[in-house]
Amino acid sequence: MQHYLIVWTFPTVEGSWESCPGFADYINAGGPGDSFEGFQLKYRVCEPIGGSGVAIAEATDIGKVWAHLGPWIKGYGIQFEVSAVVTDAEFASMWPGVAAVAEAE
């Protein structure tokens, strides 16, 4: 599973405000789209005044992340930036191999 950093922003404050009832309903329903085969939302925080937020997810591939974000893009026009990231432990385990390749160059 790959970790992904998801950063979102609403194009307008009005759009952010209009999404609040739907988002509250989604959270109150237990976040039904936050976990499915090949995808698990690990953490989400929102900055509701400015209409932005950040999440960390684990997914088998970027297509699973897109599937999770699709309804929010279509329904509310939210803009997302998605980056593959690693945990501290993953970084530490990868570093020796990366350093070895860098030294060989």
Language model segments and positions:
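Conserved, structured core segments of small domains
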Residues: 1-105
